[in-house]
């Protein structure tokens, strides 16, 4: 009996010791890389030792979490809802990349094979990606894949497979999803399962790279991309990496112009110069989103990504690596000992400061615009209810893949820096609860911040002739001040006693102050943060106005300009005399709504300098006008524009001097929606570099909706690539003529619409060029195009009916995964009637043509078909001569 008890005791001791040895081995294996990483740093030796000792706590967390992941259970029979990426990699290559970090991580690409969606396997190159040790763990590394030009993957030559950084795996993905819904440029990202050498590695984010392919995936014009990840306190041009298409740099250096605006002396002109190169709307949306999701990853020194859009002449920010929804807001290592492990909620409205944001926030119009976008997000796209529903749907999709991922780990700040911490399925489920709780509290906090808007006032009779109203606005949101009921003569006064008459509804902005950084203890990023303050406004009212009635009217004259809530002002009873030197606002700080209309004609109008119609203004050209344009002079309208010609009284836009071409006529931007050109002849123009943008079309239509043009002629341009250029717009163009075109007669880029009854004659290049556009064309005649009658490229979707292409080099060309359906058409006396081929390697193939009831007459070649092209010919179409390696099929 005693022997049996001793035997059981020894067994229990053995099991206990074995368990302790296992735990100890986990702790040692966790502590070793932490200590090694710290001892490789430049910190003093005593600090390294102390940090390593403290890191034993982190090692304990890692060790126990590792044990929990081993014990995880999941249902292997659950259906998988996300696509697979399957890589076969060079043996030992992952270990080589991890052998001498950080230098070995990205020093070379290794060979691999990638399974494509069509079931074919192609050779690719791969390496680690990322800037931290978190992304270089051999168990689940973040990777960059490079394909050959011959075999792009989903139209990408470069793409990234990124190990998600948060426990819920959504902080970057969902931030980018929200950005896309809000119209902010961002990466195209999706969840995938990654298999390496037939072994499941885990859940990844498949995402585009910071390059031209990312822009094309977002239907944006290729242009310069600026990457700022190693910036000094004062930004300089050479601190940014420049990528993408740099053709725009021939005319200007957009980033240098932006930097000059940032560091110019503070003034109204400085703010104007900032918004002349930076899109105020896009930057306001960008910062509203950062505020919504608590994104503090973009700071003074890194995570800055910008794109210069050549079609708009403006820089805009790109959402990338946003690390939102609390990822970087968890307690620090020391705080974890006394605080719950939950993300901080009350990141200030203005977030982390940086040189660009610092200047932008000093413009009250920008703050107001940012606040309006934020309020819209909080009540619509980014409301708690909407975010919760969308995330629940997303989790349902990724749950089966996440639960079987035994390599999942998240970023956590440890005593030696940010580190990769494994977590279990239980912790994954708990992270969802934490995120929903954070979103709800964050939204409540932001709504309170936007509701923070207060008004106080004082009425002063400083003489028998003058009653002064002093108004102080304080808080985060601007205030609407309704002057109706205050009499006919209300003036605003500035510090110099200058007066300006005002009326109706006016917007009053609060002040802004530099305040101590209190919310990031121990993590000083900037010397100060910009926060809410007060601003004084001074008004002069009729001296005969009854004071009691005035007080009564003022009680309902103010409301929050963001939330719309009424503001009850407080009457303060200071006895001090008014010191006008304290009134530091200018009259223009009180914003009034204006809608200026510019009218040209009728009769002869001579333009000897550029005419710019600004946002919110309108241009009307009267019937019977003749606009004579001097050498190089242009007309750019950013407001609604009406060329109001009639058959009896048409409009002409032509040269003032027959030998000197004018520049361009351009209609640009969302405020120009609904512009109309009718019964107008444009002739003799060229091109122009205007407002940071090279306009390639004599007549240019860009970034507008519902553009209408009919009964017009566009002809005889010089120098410019296009006679009419339409980009990022919707349109209908009918009953018009285009002739003697220096390049393409019409160029449609990223646009959609209808064209009807057009005659195109003598284009030196293409009759009509389509890129990434959707157009329905009917009754079009193209004669004598020097290159192509119709050029259909870059995934365009075009339908052509009842049309004719005659005497052109190529009648119709279809390229780069475009789709053309052509019906009831005649192609005659062309060198090649139809050609279908690949031009841009990114698209991975030539495309498709559907031919119905088309007549081929006297062409040298009827069809030239590249291998892999799809050509369907319906019964009744006779094809005489074909060339190329491809073939066509008959549809009966």
Model-based region annotation:
Residues 182-193, 627-628:
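Short, well-structured beta-strand/strand-turn elements
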Residues 499-892:
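Beta-strand/loop edge motif enriched in small/polar residues
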């Amino acid at each position: 009996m005693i022997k049996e008890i001793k035997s059981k005791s020894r067994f229990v001791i053995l099991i206990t010791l074995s368990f302790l040895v296992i735990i100890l081995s986990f702790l040692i294996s966790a502590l070793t890389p932490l200590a090694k990483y710290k001892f490789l740093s430049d910190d003093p030796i005593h600090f390294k030792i102390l940090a390593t000792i403290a890191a034993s706590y982190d090692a304990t967390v890692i060790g126990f979490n590792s044990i929990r992941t081993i014990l995880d259970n999941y249902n292997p029979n659950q259906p998988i809802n996300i696509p697979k990426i399957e890589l076969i990699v060079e043996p030992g290559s992952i270990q080589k990349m991890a052998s001498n970090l950080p230098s070995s991580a990205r020093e070379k690409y290794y060979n691999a094979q990638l399974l494509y969606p069509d079931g074919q396997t192609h050779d690719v190159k791969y390496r680690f990606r990322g800037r931290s040790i978190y992304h270089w763990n051999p168990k689940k590394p973040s990777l960059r894949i490079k394909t050959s030009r011959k075999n792009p993957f989903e139209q990408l030559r470069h793409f990234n497979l990124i190990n998600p950084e948060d426990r819920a795996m959504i902080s970057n993905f969902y931030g980018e999803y929200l950005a896309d819904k809000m119209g902010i440029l961002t990466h195209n990202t999706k969840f995938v399962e990654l298999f390496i050498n037939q072994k499941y590695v885990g859940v990844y984010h498949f995402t585009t790279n910071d390059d031209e392919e990312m822009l094309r995936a977002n239907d944006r014009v290729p242009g310069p991309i600026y990457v700022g990840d190693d910036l000094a306190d004062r930004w300089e041009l050479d601190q940014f990496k420049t990528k993408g298409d740099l053709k725009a740099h021939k005319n200007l250096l957009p980033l240098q112009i932006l930097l000059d605006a940032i560091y110019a002396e503070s003034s109204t002109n400085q703010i104007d110069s900032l918004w002349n190169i930076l899109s105020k709307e896009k930057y306001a949306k960008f910062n509203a989103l950062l505020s919504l999701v608590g994104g503090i990853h973009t700071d003074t020194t890194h995570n800055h990504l910008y794109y210069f859009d050549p079609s708009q002449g403006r820089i805009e920010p790109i959402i990338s690596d946003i690390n939102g929804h609390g990822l970087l807001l968890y307690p620090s290592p020391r705080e974890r000992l006394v605080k719950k492990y939950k993300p901080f909620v009350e990141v200030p409205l203005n977030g982390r400061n940086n040189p660009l944001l610092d200047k932008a926030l000093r413009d009250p119009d920008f703050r107001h615009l940012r606040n309006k976008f934020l309020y819209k997000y909080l009540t619509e796209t980014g409301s708690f209810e909407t975010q919760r529903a969308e995330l629940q749907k997303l989790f349902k999709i990724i749950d089966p893949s996440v639960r079987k991922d035994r390599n999942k780990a998240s970023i956590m700040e440890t005593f030696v820096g940010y580190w990769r911490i494994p977590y279990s399925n239980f912790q994954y489920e708990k992270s969802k609860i934490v995120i929903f709780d954070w979103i709800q509290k964050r939204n409540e906090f932001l709504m309170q911040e936007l509701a923070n808007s207060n008004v106080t006032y004082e009425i002063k009779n400083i003489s028998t002739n003058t009653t002064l109203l002093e108004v102080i606005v304080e808080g985060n949101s601007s205030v609407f001040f309704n002057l109706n009921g205050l009499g006919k003569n209300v003036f605003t006064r500035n510090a110099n006693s200058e007066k300006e008459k005002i009326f109706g509804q006016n917007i009053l902005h609060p002040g802004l102050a530099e305040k101590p950084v209190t919310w990031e203890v121990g993590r000083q990023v900037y010397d100060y943060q910009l926060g809410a303050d007060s601003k004084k406004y001074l008004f002069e009212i009729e001296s005969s106005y009854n004071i009691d009635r005035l007080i009564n009217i003022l009680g309902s004259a103010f409301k929050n300009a963001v939330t719309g809530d009424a503001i009850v002002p407080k009457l303060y009873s200071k006895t001090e005399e008014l010191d006008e030197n304290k009134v530091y606002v200018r009259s223009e700080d009180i914003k009034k709504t204006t809608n200026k209309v510019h009218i040209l004609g009728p009769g002869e109008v001579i333009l000897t300098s550029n005419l710019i119609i600004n946002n919110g203004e309108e241009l009307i050209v009267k019937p019977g006008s003749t606009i004579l344009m001097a050498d190089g002079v242009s007309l750019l309208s950013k407001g609604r524009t009406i060329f109001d010609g009639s058959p009896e009284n048409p409009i002409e836009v032509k040269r003032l001097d027959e030998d000197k071409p004018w520049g361009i006529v351009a209609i640009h931007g969302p405020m120009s929606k609904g512009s109309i050109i009718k019964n107008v002849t444009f002739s003799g123009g060229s091109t122009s570099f205007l407002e940071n943008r090279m306009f390639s079309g004599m007549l240019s239509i860009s970034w507008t909706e519902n553009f209408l043009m009919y009964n017009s002629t566009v002809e005889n341009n010089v120098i410019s690539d296009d006679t009419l250029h339409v980009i990022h717009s919707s349109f209908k163009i009918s009953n018009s003529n285009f002739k003697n075109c220096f390049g393409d007669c019409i160029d449609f880029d990223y646009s959609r619409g209808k064209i009807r009854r057009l005659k195109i004659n003598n284009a030196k290049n293409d009759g009509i060029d389509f890129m990434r556009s959707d157009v329905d064309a009917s009754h079009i005649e193209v004669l004598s195009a020097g290159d192509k009658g119709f050029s259909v490229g870059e995934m365009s979707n075009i339908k052509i009916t009842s049309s004719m292409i005659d005497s052109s080099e190529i009648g119709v060309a279809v390229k780069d995964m475009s789709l053309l359906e052509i019906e009831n058409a005649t192609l005659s006396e062309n060198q090649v009637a139809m050609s279908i081929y690949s031009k841009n390697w990114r698209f991975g193939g030539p495309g498709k043509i559907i031919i119905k009831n088309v007549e081929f007459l006297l062409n040298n070649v009827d069809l030239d078909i590249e291998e892999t092209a799809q050509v369907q010919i319906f019964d009744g179409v006779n094809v005489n001569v074909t060339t190329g390696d491809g073939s066509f099929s008959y549809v009966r």
